[in-house]
Amino acid sequence: MRTYTPKPGDINRQWHVIDATDVVLGRLASQTAILLRGKHKATFASHMDMGDFVIIINAEKVALTGAKLEQKRAYRHSGYPGGLTSVNYAELLESNPVRAVEKAIKGMLPKNSLAAQQLGKLKVYRGAEHPHAAQQPKTFEITQVAQ
């Protein structure tokens, strides 16, 4: 018996919408990375982009546990000498919550050329509105442990 390898035409992509209200950022990122990679499908192949489209709404209401809000820092570099800047997550979530969520999800995707393709299927929105109603996304519930 031969191993089944999915063809690009066999891939069936769905749209999922996730409400990030009071969801812990790490749990949100790991579940979203699984959907973006396609690991929830029986026909998963690590060398192909099998994943679904994911819409995350209410990114500004995402939760961080413990003291991460003040202690965890997000770094970026301008490319110039001495151009390293950092900001804690309290300031980052206030100014740009979309970037905080995208950064967490990007860190949970593989570090290869497929990651950019998979990250392109991620749509993050600050509020509850999104322009993808025509795609008829299914709601995806993330099970929570009580905080």
Curated annotation (Swiss-Prot):
The lineage of its organism: Bacteria, Bacillati, Actinomycetota, Actinomycetes, Micrococcales. Part of the 50S ribosomal subunit. Belongs to the universal ribosomal protein uL13 family. InterPro entries: Ribosomal_uL13, Ribosomal_uL13_bac-type, Ribosomal_uL13_sf. It comes from Pseudarthrobacter chlorophenolicus (strain ATCC 700700 / DSM 12829 / CIP 107037 / JCM 12360 / KCTC 9906 / NCIMB 13794 / A6) (Arthrobacter chlorophenolicus). One of its GO terms (cellular component) is cytosolic large ribosomal subunit. The keyword Ribosomal protein applies. GO terms for molecular function: mRNA binding; structural constituent of ribosome. GO terms for biological process: negative regulation of translation; translation. This is Large ribosomal subunit protein uL13. The gene is rplM.
